[in-house]
C-alpha cells in the first residue's frame, strides 16, 4: 500500500518560444541589399521603394541606402522605403 496520497498534476508549465519580431534597423540607418529591416506578423509596415516583402511579411532591403519610415495614403499606413545614399 502507498504511504502517500497521490498528488494531482498541474495544468501549467508551458510557454511558446519568442519569435523575435520587431524593427531590426531604424530610420536613417544605412543598409545593404538583403538586410532585414522589420520582422512582423501581417503588414504593420508596408514595403515602399527599394524594400521587398518575404512570404512571412518580413521587410528587407533590395538596394543599398538609408532607411526612411513614413506614414502616407488615405489610411495613414506606415511605409518603409530606402533612399539611395
From Swiss-Prot:
This is Large ribosomal subunit protein bL27. Signal peptide: none annotated. One of its GO terms (cellular component) is cytosolic large ribosomal subunit. Belongs to the bacterial ribosomal protein bL27 family. One of its GO terms (molecular function) is structural constituent of ribosome. The gene is rpmA. SUPFAM superfamilies: Ribosomal L27 protein-like (SSF110324). Keywords: Ribonucleoprotein, Ribosomal protein. Residues 1-21 are annotated as: Disordered. It holds the Pfam family Ribosomal_L27. GO terms for biological process: translation. The keyword Ribonucleoprotein applies. It comes from the Bacteria. InterPro entries: Ribosomal_bL27, Ribosomal_bL27_CS. PANTHER family: LARGE RIBOSOMAL SUBUNIT PROTEIN BL27M, RIBOSOMAL PROTEIN L27.
